[in-house]
Amino acid sequence: MQVILTQDVEKVGRRGDIVDVSRGYVRNYLVPRGLAEVATPAKLEEARRRMEEAAERERRLAERAEEIAETLNKSVITIEARTGEDERLFGSVTAANIAEAIEKARGIHLDRRKIRLEEPIRSLGTHQVPVQVHGEIEASVKVIVVPKL
């Protein structure tokens, strides 16, 4: 029996999926718990339309992410950091600092968790920092850490 899942169901499918399951499973488990609804022709058409809209939305997001990645690959971000007499940093430059600098310089808001720093930057100079823009789309930003005067 075909049903449209209204929520993610373990070992069955994700929300919005159209799946074939046994009648007993539908009648005794999925429908009473509000996890699925029986797939009528009208509901199937509605679900297909929603899936097409989601695919289009995902395609637009991927296009935008490609543009952002291209911009980031060309970007050089300068971050000023406090240093001691021996040119060592007080503290470090973190992913949050880099995200803030990118937003100020390029107007691109990135979540700090998308910046793939294995360890915070603790030295002056030029560093290549990988950024996961969207899904599998990645970019590399050139970050220059200079002493604050």
From Swiss-Prot:
Keywords of this entry: Ribonucleoprotein, Ribosomal protein, RNA-binding, rRNA-binding
Q: Which Gene3D superfamilies match?
A: Ribosomal protein L9, C-terminal domain (3.10.430.100), Ribosomal protein L9, N-terminal domain (3.40.5.10)
One GO BP annotation is:
translation
Q: Which GO terms describe its molecular function?
A: rRNA binding; structural constituent of ribosome
Q: Do you know which Pfam families this protein is assigned to? A: Ribosomal_L9_C (PF03948), Ribosomal_L9_N (PF01281)
* SUPFAM superfamilies according to UniProt: L9 N-domain-like, Ribosomal protein L9 C-domain
- GO annotation, cellular component aspect: ribonucleoprotein complex; ribosome
Name the InterPro entries on file: Ribosomal_bL9, Ribosomal_bL9/RNase_H1_N, Ribosomal_bL9_bac/chp, Ribosomal_bL9_C, Ribosomal_bL9_C_sf, Ribosomal_bL9_N, Ribosomal_bL9_N_sf
The similarity comment for this entry is: Belongs to the bacterial ribosomal protein bL9 family.
What's the stated role of this polypeptide? Answer: Binds to the 23S rRNA.
**Name of the protein this chain belongs to:** Large ribosomal subunit protein bL9
Q: Which organism is it from?
A: Rubrobacter xylanophilus (strain DSM 9941 / JCM 11954 / NBRC 16129 / PRD-1)
Lineage from the top down?
A: Bacteria, Bacillati, Actinomycetota, Rubrobacteria, Rubrobacterales
